[in-house]
Amino acid sequence: MKIVCALDSFKGSLTSLQAANAIKEGIGEKHEVIIKPLADGGEGTVDALCECMHAKKRTISVTGPFLEEVNATYGMTENNTAIIEMCSAAGITLVQKEQLDPYRATTFGVGEIIQDAFNHGCRKFLIGIGGS
């Protein structure tokens, strides 16, 4: 039997790939399990789109929501399209509950990702804004 695991992430706990792999492990080797990650524009979007578009991932250090350094990963396709998750640099999972204040937070790091992708030849940009 073929089983398709097409899941979105579980916010703050598992990526779509981690969740699908856990299901695959639970099913065992008796059945063929096909993993197809999904995303809604938030966390997991880069993973899902890079897999289906055969894009390379690049991780860089950028400015987080409160000027702290964070690592952000984005994808680059062969036709110079960048795949970016806004939440990797300005996501709600990067903010402690007591820090939730949009007037003090910044999205500067998202611009740094765009600039890095541009400097590496990207001229088209897919930017998921979920989870930010």
Predicted regions located by residue number:
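N-terminal loops that bind phosphate or other acidic moieties
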Residues: 1-129
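IQ-motif-like calmodulin-binding regions
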Residues: 132
